[in-house]
Amino acid sequence: MCVSRLVLLLGLLLCVGAQLSNGQHWSHGWYPGGKRELDSFGTSEISEEIKLCEAGECSYLTPQRRSVLRNILLDALARELQKRK
C-alpha cells in the first residue's frame, strides 16, 4: 500500500515537473514545431542532387539490401569467431 502511494506520488511529480519545466531545446536554424529556416539550404546543393537524379545516378534511391545483408552476416560470423577464440 505504501509502495503504491509512493509510485503514484512520484508519477504525479514527474508529470507536474515536466509541464512546468522549460526543457525544450531548439537546435541552430530550427524553430518551434520542427520548422527550419529555408535560407540555410544552399540552392546549388539541391539543384546538383536533382541533376544527378534526373541522370539516373541516385545512389540513395537504389536498394542497398544486398550490402546490408552481407554486412549483417559478416558481423555475425565475426562474433562467432571471437566467441570460439
Curated annotation (Swiss-Prot):
Pfam families assigned: GnRH
Glycine amide modification sites are: 33
**Localisation:** Secreted
- Keywords attached to this entry: Amidation, Cleavage on pair of basic residues, Hormone, Pyrrolidone carboxylic acid, Secreted, Signal
List residues, modification Pyrrolidone carboxylic acid: 24
Entry function: Stimulates the secretion of gonadotropins.
The source's superkingdom equals Eukaryota
Coiled coil ranges: none
For the keyword Glycoprotein, the answer is no
Name recorded for this polypeptide? Progonadoliberin-2
Q: Which family does it belong to?
A: Belongs to the GnRH family.
**rRNA processing among keywords:** no
Name the source organism: Sparus aurata
Identify the GO cellular component terms for this protein.
Answer: extracellular space
Q: What is its main location?
A: secreted
**One MF term from GO for this chain?**
gonadotropin hormone-releasing hormone activity
Q: Name the PANTHER family for this protein.
A: GONADOLIBERIN (PTHR10522), PROGONADOLIBERIN (PTHR10522:SF8)
Q: Where are the transmembrane segments?
A: none
The signal peptide, as residue positions, is 1-23
